[in-house]
Amino acid sequence: MKKRALVSVSDKTGVVEFVKGLLEQGIEVISTGGTKKLLEENGLQVIGISEVTGFPEIMDGRVKTLHPNIHGGLLAVRDNETHVAQMNELGIEPIDFVIVNLYPFKETIAKPDVTFADAIENIDIGGPTMIRSAAKNHKFVSVIVDPVDYDVVLAELEENGEVKEETKRKLAAKVFRHTAAYDALISNYLTEQMGEESPETLTVTFEKKQDLRYGENPHQKATFYKAPFAATSSVAYAEQLHGKELSYNNINDADAALSIVKEFTEPAVVAVKHMNPCGVGVGTDIHEAYTRAYEADPVSIFGGIIAANREIDKSTAEKLHEIFLEIIIAPSFSKEALEVLQNKKNLRLLTVNIEKSTSASKKLTSVQGGLLVQEEDTLSLDESTISIPTKREPSEQEWKDLKLAWKVVKHVKSNAIVLAKDDMTIGVGAGQMNRVGSAKIAITQAGEKAQGSALASDAFFPMPDTLEEAAKAGITAIIQPGGSIRDEDSIKVADTYGIAMVFTGVRHFKH
C-alpha cells in the first residue's frame, strides 16, 4: 500500500523542499489550508484534507482534521487484526507521516498590542491532537514538529526506504516535549491574565540555549536554558562578540554582575567573583567608573567578570586589557575597543541591553524534592519611608556613599556588609554566619580607607557589636533596615560616636 503523509505547518521553513523529497520517495501527501496552497504554488501535487475526510473545513478552519478518517489512520495498530479489519470496513487508510507545527501562540502573545481574543484564537486544537495521536503510535507513524529534523528523515528514507525505529522514538519524545511546552505557555498566559499568583500547579517551560562543558565542577553535567519571555536585559539574551564559550560559572557570575550594574543610572562598573561583587565604582564616565571599581579591590578582580552600563571606549579597553578577566559585559564596545580586547583570544565579550526591570519577575530556586518561587528583589531605596533615629543626620557626601552601599549590599550573600566611600566600594563582607564577622572582613579589606566611610547592612543589627567595630574603624554613617528589639542599643552606640544612622524598613537577605 502506498504510504501517506499529512502536512500542515505554521512554520513553513523548508517544507516545500521536504515535501518534494517525500513525493520523490513515492509518498502521497495530504495537506490543509495555507500549507496546501503554498505547496501547490510550488508545483507540488497534494491531496486536500476534505478529500480524505469527506467533510469540508468549517468554522474558519477550527475543524478540519478532527475526524475519524484522520485519527483512525494515525492511531490504528497495523499488526492488530481487529484494527486492520475496522479500517477496511470503514474505508480508513493509514497515515504514515505527520508533519505539523502549531499555531504561533508564543509569537502572538509576545506582541505588545495583542488582545485576549487574538491569543485565544491562536490556541491550536487540531494540531496537538494529531501529533499526539501520531506520537502515541510512533511504532508505525513518523511525526515531525521541527524543521531541523526534515533532513534526518529524508536521509533515512533515501537510505533505507523507511525511518529507523530509534528515530521514530526520538521524534515522538520531541512531540510530547513540544506539546507540553505549548500547553505550559497557554496555561501561564491564562493564569497571568486571571491574576493568579500561586496556582495549585505550576508548569514552566524553557528553551535550550546551549550545552555547557560541565557544571559548577568538572564532574557535574550542565545545560543552559532560557525562558521564552525573559527580559532582553539578561545573560540568556546577550550576544557574544568574542572569546571562548561561556561556562556554567561564567553565566552565574555574569548574571550577578548584570543585576548589580542595573542598579545605577550614572556610569558604573561592577567586578564580580563567585557571584559576589568585589568592586563597584561610579563616575562621570565609564573610564573613571572602571578605575574606581579596580581600585576597590585590585587583588580579587583578577579573573573576574566586569559589567558596565555604558559603551566600552578605547581608553577603558586598554586598562581592561592590562589584567586577566573572564568576561566583559556592556551595552556596546567601540570599534577601537574591540580591536584592543580581541587580542585576548579567550576573553569573552558580551553585549546586552542594560535596563532595570520595573516589575518583579519570578525567581525559581530548586530544593530537594521541590521548588521555591518568589518575586525577584527589585525594590529600590524609598527616601520617603526612611527614618533617622540618631542625633546626627548624614551629610551630603555620606548620603551619596550610603546610597551606593545600599544598592550593592542587596546583591551580596548574607550576612552582608558593604563599605563605600567617594563613589566606590572599599570593603565587602559576604556570607558569614554572624553579622559582625562580615563587618570585620569588610573593615579589614578597607583598611585606612574605612575612616570616614559609609556602611550598609542587608539586615538589622541583633546586637550593637557591629556598631562598635564600625566606630573603631572610623565609619561615620550607617544604613540598615532596623527592626531589632535591640535597636535602641545600636542607636545609643551610634550617638556616642557621632555616627549618623538611617533605617530603611526594608531587609535584603540573599542566599
From Swiss-Prot:
Q: Per its UniProt entry, which superkingdom is the organism in?
A: Bacteria
Q: Which reaction does it catalyse?
A: (6R)-10-formyltetrahydrofolate + 5-amino-1-(5-phospho-beta-D-ribosyl)imidazole-4-carboxamide = 5-formamido-1-(5-phospho-D-ribosyl)imidazole-4-carboxamide + (6S)-5,6,7,8-tetrahydrofolate; IMP + H2O = 5-formamido-1-(5-phospho-D-ribosyl)imidazole-4-carboxamide
Named in its record, the pathway it takes part in is: Purine metabolism; IMP biosynthesis via de novo pathway; 5-formamido-1-(5-phospho-D-ribosyl)imidazole-4-carboxamide from 5-amino-1-(5-phospho-D-ribosyl)imidazole-4-carboxamide (10-formyl THF route): step 1/1; Purine metabolism; IMP biosynthesis via de novo pathway; IMP from 5-formamido-1-(5-phospho-D-ribosyl)imidazole-4-carboxamide: step 1/1
UniProt GO molecular function = IMP cyclohydrolase activity; phosphoribosylaminoimidazolecarboxamide formyltransferase activity
Q: So what EC number does this one have?
A: 2.1.2.3, 3.5.4.10
Q: Does the keyword Transferase apply?
A: yes
Give every MGS-like domain span. Answer: 1-145
Q: Does the keyword Ribosomal protein apply?
A: no
According to its UniProt entry, the protein's GO biological process terms are: 'de novo' IMP biosynthetic process
Please name the InterPro entries in this protein's record: AICAR_Tfase_dup_dom_sf, Cytidine_deaminase-like, MGS-like_dom, MGS-like_dom_sf, PurH-like
What does the UniProt keyword field contain? Hydrolase, Multifunctional enzyme, Purine biosynthesis, Transferase
GO CC terms of this entry: cytosol
Instruction: Please name the Pfam families in this protein's record.
Output: AICARFT_IMPCHas, MGS
The family this protein is said to belong to: Belongs to the PurH family.
HAMAP family listed in its UniProt record: PurH
NCBIfam families registered for this protein in UniProt: PRK00881.1 (NF002049), purH (TIGR00355)
* Comment block on domains: The IMP cyclohydrolase activity resides in the N-terminal region.
Its name, as the record gives it, is Bifunctional purine biosynthesis protein PurH
Q: Gene name, please?
A: purH
